[in-house]
Amino acid sequence: MEGSKRKHDSRRLQQEQEQLRPRTPPSYEEIAKYGHSFNVKRFTNEEMCLKNDYPRIISYNPPPK
């Protein structure tokens, strides 16, 4: 049990160190390896509202001329 606690603490310390380090832009090899995952970001409330509006905007048909 004591060993598992120690492992958890070291993992948390590693995450804190990663947050402190400035993020470098991904190299071409990393982009080729991981693809779109670099562009994935957390949604803010505003972005979520915009995302929810898309189906209504797309389904809107302009009146025929």
Swiss-Prot record:
Location of the region described as Disordered in the Swiss-Prot/TrEMBL record: 1-27
Biased composition (Basic and acidic residues): 11-21
Signal peptide annotation: none
Pfam families: Orthopox_F8
Protein name as catalogued: Protein OPG052
Induction, as annotated: Expressed in the early phase of the viral replicative cycle.
Biased composition (Basic residues): 1-10
Sorted UniProt keywords: Early protein
Annotated organism of origin: Vaccinia virus (strain Western Reserve)
Protein family membership: Belongs to the orthopoxvirus OPG052 family.
